[in-house]
């Protein structure tokens, strides 16, 4: 086993990982940084984000407005000091990306263009056509190449982190190209491994988004927080889960049922706004949890359209015109044509909700550090407390760079103040990781990782979907317990060294099963409806601030199901209130202004 000595190790080279690496390199030019990724950086899942990144930029917008939209959108489960820090940091990061070369779309006068996203009452989403994630990731990757102290380990799969005397001290990874192991020692480690959307059958996530970082931190005793909150995006393509960006609706797209009716006006997001009126009043720009829930009700009422790929509604962009679609949503036109054979210029796009984003994750403090000294987390794998029970669109790309920078700066400080590690203890841990890998490779079993993964995805969709019941969640919990037992009998049939995906998918599945259990156990024990967690059981259909205005913490239990604890939500300036959108929000805004003016 090779050994590489670094000061800081970063697991994941997407938006958060690259931003952390750049921040660390700028904080201390002498710092030796190891950047480990199981794919080439430009294949990280950040590249798939289409819509945009939030930051206050207009005169009629403010940090307070962004703060209010985020806290209300998260159904008051956000850590409000974290949200405050976030909204004030976003403009700096967007400007920094521009200075590094990110080609933000612009208005005719040359100023940065912004569009509105769901749940945001003011246009504040910066975008680069409909390939924002690609351009942000490319900009960060290009910028990272300026720093020779950042050493990349592309196509290296991290097997485990090393912890000595209560501090993260490195990791062990497998070089996928050669099949050899490498021990990377460091005084601090940052997890930037993305979410866990692949635990669901249909999802918008790339194949690499399997919850690896969450699973590793979890098994080392770090709790996973608020894992019951999994966002369904309302506009995925049927069958594939390919995302039709929220930017479609931000540009003025509408959603209709089989009767051509803009049905969202029946679910607290109306009244109907005539086409061509200010888009920030469009009912289609409600928060994602509520828009996805409206689809479920339309389906139950028989007002969706049946297709071979499942029931759908339509996303209609035709009234925007060919010129605007080709200029502002060119990638969407390509995707719709390629995956469902639809030209958005001429016909509506069939869509349905699909699993999209993990609001919960590795619990961290405001500096992105976990309960293990020197172990940090940033991006979708983390739970710093920003999103609460429902993330607003375009806050996630901004989160990557805001908290990627914070994690990089604080991990640098932690690394520099740390005493030397116990090398022999790290070597012993690394040998243990190697032995576990060999045991897995030689395991004589009868189970297939692919079959277990498929059954997990179906079960999670049935029990932990848009609407949940005790009965369905319990079935999912029972199924997951069965699958974890069967996982102990998985047989790896490929024993080659080079790009052994049979082995890698098996290891990923182990993490996914742990994460899925945390999601389901956290969900069945939250006996209320809040944000993306909606229950149909009697007594659980409403938000319950008295008993459940708190975070769920899932701790690893080697003997079975995760152990749950709860912690308070930090409320600093916006007390819990009813979430209102559409006409009801307009009426409240008018009333607030009248009261303010006496």
Curated annotation (Swiss-Prot):
The UniProt record lists the keyword Electron transport: yes
Assigned keywords, A-Z: Cell inner membrane, Cell membrane, Electron transport, FAD, Flavoprotein, Membrane, Nucleotide-binding, Oxidoreductase, Transport
Signal peptide feature range: none
UniProt function note: Two distinct, membrane-bound, FAD-containing enzymes are responsible for the catalysis of fumarate and succinate interconversion; the fumarate reductase is used in anaerobic growth, and the succinate dehydrogenase is used in aerobic growth.
Quaternary data: Part of an enzyme complex containing four subunits: a flavoprotein (FrdA), an iron-sulfur protein (FrdB), and two hydrophobic anchor proteins (FrdC and FrdD). Interacts with SdhE.
Family: Belongs to the FAD-dependent oxidoreductase 2 family. FRD/SDH subfamily.
Name of the protein in question: Fumarate reductase flavoprotein subunit
Organism: Serratia sp. (strain ATCC 39006)
Lineage: Bacteria, Pseudomonadati, Pseudomonadota, Gammaproteobacteria, Enterobacterales
């Amino acid at each position: 086993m090779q050994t590489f000595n670094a000061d800081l190790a970063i697991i994941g080279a997407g938006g958060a990982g690259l931003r952390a690496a750049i921040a660390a390199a700028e904080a201390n030019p002498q710092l030796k940084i190891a950047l480990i990724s199981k794919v080439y950086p430009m294949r990280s899942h950040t590249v798939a984000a289409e819509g945009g990144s939030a930051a206050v930029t207009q005169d009629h917008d403010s940090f307070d407005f962004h703060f209010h939209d985020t806290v209300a959108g998260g159904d008051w489960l956000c850590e409000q000091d974290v949200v405050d820090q976030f909204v004030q940091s976003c403009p700096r990061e967007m400007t920094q990306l521009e200075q590094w070369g990110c080609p933000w779309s612009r208005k005719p006068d040359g100023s940065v263009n912004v569009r509105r996203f769901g749940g945001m009452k003011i246009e504040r989403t910066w975008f680069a056509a409909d390939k924002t994630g690609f351009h942000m990731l490319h900009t960060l990757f290009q910028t990272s190449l300026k720093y020779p102290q950042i050493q990349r380990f592309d196509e290296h799969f991290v097997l485990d982190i090393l912890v000595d005397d209560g501090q993260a001290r490195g990791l062990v990874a497998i070089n996928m190209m050669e099949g050899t192991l490498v021990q990377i020692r460091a005084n601090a480690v940052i997890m930037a491994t993305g979410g866990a959307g692949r635990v669901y059958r249909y999802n918008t996530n790339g194949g690499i988004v399997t919850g690896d970082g969450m699973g590793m931190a979890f098994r080392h005793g770090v709790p996973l927080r608020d894992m019951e909150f999994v966002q369904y995006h309302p506009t995925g393509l049927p069958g594939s889960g390919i995302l039709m960006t929220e930017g479609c609706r931000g540009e003025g797209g509408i959603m209709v049922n089989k009767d051509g009716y803009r049905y969202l006006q029946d679910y607290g997001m109306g009244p109907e706004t005539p086409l061509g009126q200010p888009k920030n009043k469009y009912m289609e720009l409600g928060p994602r949890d509520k828009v996805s829930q409206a689809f479920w009700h339309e389906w139950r009422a028989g007002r969706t359209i049946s297709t071979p790929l499942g029931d759908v509604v339509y996303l209609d962009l035709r009234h925007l015109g060919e010129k605007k679609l080709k200029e502002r949503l060119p990638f969407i036109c390509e995707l719709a044509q390629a995956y469902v054979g639809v030209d958005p210029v001429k016909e509506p796009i069939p869509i349905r909700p699909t699993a999209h984003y993990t609001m919960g994750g590795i619990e961290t403090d405001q500096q992105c550090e976990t309960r293990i000294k020197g172990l940090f987390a940033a991006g979708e794998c983390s739970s710093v407390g920003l999103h609460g029970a429902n993330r607003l669109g375009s806050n996630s790309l901004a989160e990557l760079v805001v908290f990627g920078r914070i994690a990089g700066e604080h991990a640098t400080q932690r690394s520099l103040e740390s005493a030397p590690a116990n090398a022999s203890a790290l070597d012993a841990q690394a040998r243990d990781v190697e032995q576990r890998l060999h045991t897995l490779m030689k395991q004589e079993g009868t189970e297939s990782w692919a079959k277990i993964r498929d059954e997990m995805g179906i079960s999670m969709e049935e029990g932990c979907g848009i609407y949940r019941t005790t009965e369905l969640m319990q079935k999912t919990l029972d199924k997951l317990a069965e699958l974890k037992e069967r996982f102990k009998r998985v047989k790896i049939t490929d024993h080659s060294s080079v790009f052994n995906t049979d082995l890698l998918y098996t290891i990923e599945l182990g993490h996914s099963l742990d994460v899925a259990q945390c999601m389901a156990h956290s969900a069945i024990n939250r006996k209320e409806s809040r944000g993306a967690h909606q229950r149909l059981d009697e007594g659980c259909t409403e938000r319950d601030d008295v008993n459940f205005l708190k975070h769920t913490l899932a701790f690893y239990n080697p003997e079975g199901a995760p152990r749950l604890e709860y912690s308070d939500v930090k409320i600093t300036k916006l007390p819990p209130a009813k979430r209102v959108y559409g006409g009801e929000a307009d009426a409240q805004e008018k009333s607030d202004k009248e009261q303010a003016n006496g």
